[in-house]
From Swiss-Prot:
Gene: Actr3
Record's protein name: Actin-related protein 3
Tissue expression as described in the entry: Detected in brain and kidney glomeruli (at protein level). Detected in kidney, lung and spleen.
Subcellular location: Cytoplasm, Cytoskeleton; Cell projection; Nucleus
Classification via Gene3D superfamilies: 3.30.420.40, Actin, Chain A, domain 2, Actin, Chain A, domain 4
A Pfam short name: Actin
Highest taxon, organism lineage: Eukaryota
N6-acetyllysine modifications at: 240, 244, 251, 254
Family membership noted in the UniProt record: Belongs to the actin family. ARP3 subfamily.
Keyword match Thylakoid: no
C-alpha cells in the first residue's frame, strides 16, 4: 500500500461525468458526458459515418469543450445511465484519463460505477476497454446505489455504518429507487421513475414560456435550468404556497437576469410559481407526464413492500438520497412526511381489520439528507477506494489475462467491515 498512487474514481452519468482521485472529498472535474466528433454526411450506420483516417481519430473533444464546437457532431454516449455507444465511450475515457486526470493509467487502480440493472455483458465491455486499451493494473466496477449508501455515513443522522437501505438516486436522465440489503442490490424490486432533472427543466421551461414573453428562445432552456438550480425548492402544501405568492408577492418572487447569447443584450424575468412547481412533479408527476401518475413516496413504499419481509424495517429506516435532483430544499422532509402518512395509514388499517386486537409496532421512516448528496456516488467511491481492502477486491490485469473479461461480471462487496 505504501508508495502506491491513489486510485482513480470515475462516475459516468447521463448528464455529467464526475472524476477525480480516491481520498478526496469531491471530484476534481465535473464535465458533461458528451463527445464532439467529426462526422461525414454519408448515409449509413454510425460506424460508417465516422471519419476515421488515422489522424482524425484523435480529432475529438469531450465535456464543456465538446459543447462549444459547432462544426463537430456532439454525441451523448450514455442514455438513462447505461452506455449505448462503446466506441465513443472508449474515446471519452481516453481524454478523461490523459487530458483531465493527467494520469498514467498503468500506475493507477480504477473504480468505475455502474447503474442498477446494468448487464453483465456491459461489465465485460468496460473491462475490455480498461484492460486492453488502457492497460490498467486493477479495476473494480461498483454499483452506484451501494456507493451512495456509503456516502450517507457522513450524515449525523446515521448511527452505525450499514449497507442496508433504500437509495433514491435521481440524476439528469433517470430516477431509480433501489433497495440494498447488506451491500447487495435486490434487483427484482428496483423501480425507476421517468422523472428526473431534465424533466424538471423542461417543465419549468414550459411554465416560463407560457408566462414570460421576454426570454429569447435560444436562451430558454438555459434560463429554465438556472431557475431550477438557483431558486427552486419543495413546498409542504401547494395551495398554501400559491396563497403566499398571491398575498405577498414581493417577498417571494425573484428576479433572474440573463444575457442573450446572440445580441449580447441583458433580459430580466420574474420567477414566481416556477420556484415550487418545478420540483413538485416528483410528488405530482401528472403535472408534466400524463402517462405516469404515481408520486415518488408511493413508488418508494411499493419498492419496500416488494422486498423480503425481514429487511423492510431497516429499508424504511435508512432512505438515502443521492444525485443532483435530490438537492432541492426540503425534498427529504416532504418525502419523509408523505411516506410516513402512507405507512401509518396502512398500519391503522391493519389494526382496524383485526378489530383492534392487534397493535402493530410503529414503523420508523427516516429519509437521510447529507452534505455529500450531489456527488454521493463519487464520494462513496472515493471513500471505499481509499481503503486497503479495495486493492484486495479489485480484479487485476493478471486475473484478466488468465481468465478473460468474464471476471468483471462479479465484483465482491466490501467496506461494511471497516
Amino acid at each position: 500500500m505504501a508508495g502506491r498512487l491513489p486510485a482513480c474514481v470515475v462516475d459516468c452519468g447521463t448528464g455529467y461525468t464526475k472524476l477525480g482521485y480516491a481520498g478526496n472529498t469531491e471530484p476534481q472535474f465535473i464535465i458533461p458526458s458528451c463527445i464532439a466528433i467529426k462526422e461525414s454526411a454519408k448515409v449509413g450506420d454510425q460506424a460508417q459515418r465516422r471519419v476515421m483516417k488515422g489522424v482524425d481519430d484523435l480529432d475529438f473533444f469531450i465535456g464543456d469543450e465538446a459543447i462549444e464546437k459547432p462544426t463537430y457532431a456532439t454525441k451523448w454516449p450514455i442514455r438513462h445511465g447505461i452506455v449505448e455507444d462503446w466506441d465513443l465511450m472508449e474515446r471519452f475515457m481516453e481524454q478523461v484519463i490523459f487530458k483531465y486526470l493527467r494520469a498514467e493509467p498503468e500506475d493507477h487502480y480504477f473504480l468505475l460505477t455502474e447503474p442498477p440493472l446494468n448487464t453483465p455483458e456491459n461489465r465485460e465491455y468496460t473491462a475490455e476497454i480498461m484492460f486492453e486499451s488502457f492497460n490498467v493494473p486493477g479495476l473494480y466496477i461498483a454499483v452506484q446505489a451501494v456507493l451512495a449508501l456509503a456516502a450517507s455515513w457522513t450524515s449525523r443522522q446515521v448511527g452505525e455504518r450499514t449497507l442496508t437501505g433504500t437509495v433514491i438516486d435521481s440524476g439528469d436522465g433517470v430516477t431509480h429507487v433501489i433497495p440494498v440489503a447488506e451491500g447487495y442490490v435486490i434487483g427484482s424490486c428496483i423501480k425507476h421513475i421517468p422523472i428526473a432533472g431534465r424533466d424538471i427543466t423542461y417543465f419549468i421551461q414550459q411554465l416560463l414560456r407560457d408566462r414570460e414573453v421576454g426570454i429569447p428562445p435560444e436562451q430558454s432552456l438555459e434560463t429554465a435550468k438556472a431557475v431550477k438550480e438557483r431558486y427552486s425548492y419543495v413546498c409542504p402544501d401547494l395551495v398554501k404556497e400559491f396563497n403566499k405568492y398571491d398575498t405577498d408577492g414581493s417577498k417571494w418572487i425573484k428576479q433572474y437576469t440573463g444575457v442573450n447569447a446572440i445580441s449580447k443584450k441583458e433580459f430580466s424575468i420574474d420567477v414566481g410559481y416556477e420556484r415550487f412547481l418545478g420540483p413538485e412533479i416528483f410528488f405530482h408527476p401528472e403535472f408534466a407526464n400524463p402517462d405516469f401518475t404515481q408520486p415518488i413516496s408511493e413508488v418508494v413504499d411499493e419498492v419496500i413492500q416488494n422486498c423480503p419481509i425481514d429487511v423492510r424495517r431497516p429499508l424504511y429506516k435508512n432512505i438515502v438520497l443521492s444525485g443532483g435532483s435530490t438537492m432541492f430544499r426540503d425534498f427529504g422532509r416532504r418525502l419523509q412526511r408523505d411516506l410516513k402518512r402512507t405507512v401509518d395509514a396502512r398500519l391503522k388499517l391493519s389494526e382496524e381489520l383485526s378489530g383492534g386486537r392487534l397493535k402493530p409496532k410503529p414503523i420508523d421512516v427516516q429519509v437521510i439528507t447529507h452534505h455529500m448528496q450531489r456527488y454521493a456516488v463519487w464520494f462513496g467511491g472515493s471513500m471505499l477506494a481509499s481503503t486497503p481492502e479495495f486493492y484486495q477486491v479489485c480484479h487485476t490485469k493478471k486475473d484478466y489475462e488468465e481468465i478473460g473479461p468474464s471476471i468483471c461480471r462479479h465484483n465482491p462487496v466490501f467496506g461494511v467491515m471497516s
